[in-house]
Swiss-Prot record:
Belongs to the UBR7 family. This is Protein mlo2. The lineage of its organism: Eukaryota, Fungi, Dikarya, Ascomycota, Taphrinomycotina. It comes from Schizosaccharomyces pombe (strain 972 / ATCC 24843) (Fission yeast). Not known, interfere with mitotic chromosome segregation when overexpressed. InterPro entries: UBR7 (IPR040204), UBR7-like_UBR-box (IPR047506), Zinc_finger_PHD-type_CS (IPR019786), Znf_FYVE_PHD (IPR011011), Znf_PHD (IPR001965), Znf_PHD-finger (IPR019787), Znf_RING/FYVE/PHD (IPR013083), Znf_UBR (IPR003126). One of its GO terms (cellular component) is chromatin.
Amino acid sequence: MEETAHELTVKQYVEQQRELEREAREVLPYSFDTCTYSMGYLKQPLYACLTCQKASGSLNAVCYSCSISCHADHDLVDLFNKRHFRCDCGTTRTHSIPCNLRKSVDECGSENDYNHNFEGRFCICDTVYNPETEEGTMFQCILCEDWFHEKCLQKTNKGIAIPDAETFEWLVCSECSEKYRDHLLNQKHESIAGTERAPLFLSENFRENLCPCESCISLRNLEMPMLVAEEPIYEPPEDSEDGISEMNEDPSESGEMIEQVISSTMNDVLRILDRLPRVQANESVYAYNRLKSELTDFLTPFARENRVVTKEDISNFFLERSRISKNLR
């Protein structure tokens, strides 16, 4: 029989699943099974959930894990890294819906700070960011952590072209530079210290040029610790490479290949079961084990003989299961 686009041998299926996992790991390289709420206030990757914002009427942001495990089908805005923030998932800010990862509703982080980024708006132009249509480079202010278009920075820089991105490491937006300029740089930098309403472009070693007077040091330690030392950024642990990607390249035994296929396919089922209520989960585990056993028996001859598994074969398998199930009722 000729193989069609919908017909695969078990070995081909294994190879396809391995490639899909590799691609998925490139897009989502980190594990997403732990909410950061219990870790307190962190500088971490955040995602504003516009869906929950509409439901609760409150600005919010959730951690990397919750963006996938709890809000995957919601309208999310990637905020990148934000400092001193506690995950809002499972709080009143996300409509008091329990977090799937910690199974509870908790108080929202009272120290969280929100700006227009949490509405999906960025820069002094206050426009909605659309990654599909956005052109040009955006830079993040080291102080307020808002993001700015290169063209908008040039306008606030009195029309003077901003430096090449490779020549500076950090940005201080025009609003923050005006607010803190007396405490940012040593007064010997007269051309910079005297500039009003203009962005500052800081080199990697800018901390060596900060004003050394006691009042400025005290202010920086209290209000601008990010200028004193680089902040640690929390990153979720990398996703373990278990499952299909660890399969032997060419299993010698058909039984081994079948076990690999079944185990890999069922891993996602187990993750879902872990989030179900206990009684429902127990019933589902029984059904899961029965399906795994039946599917193993069904696929073994195909793997042993390297036969093609067709769409019709799979349909017949589930039709037979359905027929037996009805007879047992």
